[in-house]
Amino acid sequence: MSNIRRQSIISSVVIYIGFAVGLLNTYFFTRQGTRFTEADYGLTTIFIAIATMMAAFAAMAMPSYIFKFHPYYNEHLPPKKNDMITRALLVSTIGFVLVVIAGWAMKHLVIRKFGTNSPQLVAYYYWIFPMGFGLTLYTVLEAYAWSLHKSVVTNFFREVQWRLFTTVLIVLFITNTIKDFDLFIKLFAFTYPGIAVSLFAYLFFTKQIHFTFKVSKVSRRFLKKIIALCSFVYGGVLIFTISKVFDTIVIASLLNDGAAKAGIFGLATIMTSIIQAPQRGIISASVSHLSKAWKDKNMPLLQKIYQRSSINLLIFACAIFLLIWMNFADGITTFGVKPVYLSGAWIFFILGVTTIIDMGTGVN
């Protein structure tokens, strides 16, 4: 439990550093006098939403497979004969190929649904695919790293490095080094592939990742259970992910000037994510311990983790929510953010309440 506490605290600090960088990015996107329009900022949020949905479809529940079965692979196989990450990356890559085929076939639908209210999305539609592929690979590698108790490292790449990549692009755009938004959004599409390469390089050079295409005895033994688990979890993951991003996509599709409205919604979403930082840290730190506890049927440890995480996260969520809600309008005015973003206050309120309820369930 002490190891979980230590890793979750460090992870939370790293995540909040990332949020600080993210808030700086948001300020550059939304401040008065910026080169970015509301539609430009909205397009970046739409890119992230669709890339997240692509990754959920493509990953084929491989992160859940890693979380559940890594203790068995780790216990019964030497590292160089462990084929888990090879299988997971291969299946996810095949899954993304299917996503690309489906995305290409649905281009006419995208034009029909988004052409009027979000023409920017139609213009840059194919540039979402590199972003989605990068996030797919990162999600699988992240799950593997969590199982190796490397949650702090993965949180640094996802929360800090990814936002620093964005910061660099923003600064280059503001200083006119990047001449137009066309180049900016195309480079932005490669930020997720960038952190995927970084995490892979870390695992490779620290000799914590090995590839083998020979089917191991563990894979053969648990094949039916692996398929059953992934089949069961896959639908739940899709529903959960779609519920997180569907609102952004619907706003971009149905509302007049949808990309700009998605930007306003995106600001409220970012403020809501500040509340979730401790939850992300605790989940990433505890997943490997929960997997081991379930394998060993260690019910006292499971009860301790779930109970303590629920109480601590609920208290923290309520406190941060109240602080942000009471100062939302003043913050917009004080920092010189465009007044149009004040309309996101009640969006934050609704999303914040749902986040409090979610965090009250602990690491579930």
Model features per residue range: what roles?
Residues 5-9, 45, 78-94, 125, ...:
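Interfacial transmembrane-helix starts/ends
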Residues 134-158, 352-364:
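Membrane-interface junctions at transmembrane-helix termini in multi-pass inner-membrane proteins
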